[in-house]
Each structure stands twice: as C-alpha cells, then as structure tokens.
Amino acid sequence: MRIGLYPGTFDPVTNGHLDIIGRAVKLVDKLVIGVAVNIGKGPLFTLEERVATLERETAHLTKIAQIEVRPFDTLLMYFAREVGAQMIVRGLRAVADFEYEFQMTAMNQQLDREIETVFLMADPRHQAIASRLVKEIAALGGDVHKFVPPGVAEQLLAKLAK
C-alpha cells in the first residue's frame, strides 16, 4: 500500500491546501493528513477544530483513496515512520517556499533516506493564499470566501467575532 503524508498546521485550511490534498490522493492508496500541534505559531483554531474541519472538508475524497486526519507533535520524520508513509507531500507556491522546503527536505533526508518528499506546484489560482493572510484579511473585515471553503469562512468569522 502506498501511503503519503501531507503535514501542515492548517490554521485555517485553505482552498490551496484542499487542492494539494485533492491531487495527492491520486498518487497514493492512503493519504494521512498530519495536523501539527505547532504551539509556536499560536494557532487561532484548536487542534480538535482543525482536525474536524479537515475531516469534513476531505470526506468526499475518500472515494479516491483512504484519508486519515491525525494530529502530531513530534518530528515530521518520526510521525511519517509511525504512519508508515513512503512519501511526504508538500505544496510549493513560490520561490520562497522552495528555499524553505529544500532545506527541510535535506534535513529530513538525514533522518530517514527511505521516505521521499514529493512537491506539488500550487494551482495558479491558489499561489497567493496563505493561512496567515486569510486570518489577517478576515480580522480586518475582508471577504475570505474565495480563499477558503464556505464552512471554513463561517468558522473563521465566528471565531474572530468572539
């Protein structure tokens, strides 16, 4: 069984994330979506909310491949081994992403040479989307419906209204 791992903070999940997930499921028999605890980023949504949102937003893709959404709070390569992943899937939006991902991949290869990293280029419609910017736009009263699924937009607006 080919198992892929798509890790991220997903705070919130964006249309860009979902595009990568939708393409990644076609490459594997099972895709594990690893939701990083990542306390350092100070997430707006709780870990439980992010996991539940991803489960809801990816439910329709289970016809293509098995999907499992799991939180993790360890080194990525340790988590990849734990779930039996042969590949890590990463999305690239711009040159800055490539530089960061190149360095991370080089370090990850030192930890486990058996796990490959596969890069998927972001769809041009989603190249500018970043969770950080979506939160900023929403906080300043902007419309985020073109950047995130409708349910996520509503969650985001409700969270910021508190």
Curated annotation (Swiss-Prot):
Its EC number is 2.7.7.3. Pathway: Cofactor biosynthesis; coenzyme A biosynthesis; CoA from (R)-pantothenate: step 4/5. GO terms for molecular function: ATP binding; pantetheine-phosphate adenylyltransferase activity. It catalyses: (R)-4'-phosphopantetheine + ATP + H(+) = 3'-dephospho-CoA + diphosphate. Pfam families: CTP_transf_like (PF01467). The keyword Nucleotide-binding applies. The keyword Nucleotide-binding applies. Substrate binds at residues 9, 41, 76, 90. Keywords: ATP-binding, Coenzyme A biosynthesis, Cytoplasm, Magnesium, Nucleotide-binding, Nucleotidyltransferase, Transferase. GO terms for biological process: coenzyme A biosynthetic process. Its cofactor is Mg(2+). It is an enzyme of class 2 (transferase). One of its GO terms (cellular component) is cytoplasm. Transmembrane segments: none annotated. The record marks 17 as: Transition state stabilizer. ATP binds at residues 9-10, 17, 91-93, 101, 126-132. Homohexamer. Reversibly transfers an adenylyl group from ATP to 4'-phosphopantetheine, yielding dephospho-CoA (dPCoA) and pyrophosphate. Belongs to the bacterial CoaD family. This is Phosphopantetheine adenylyltransferase. The gene is coaD.
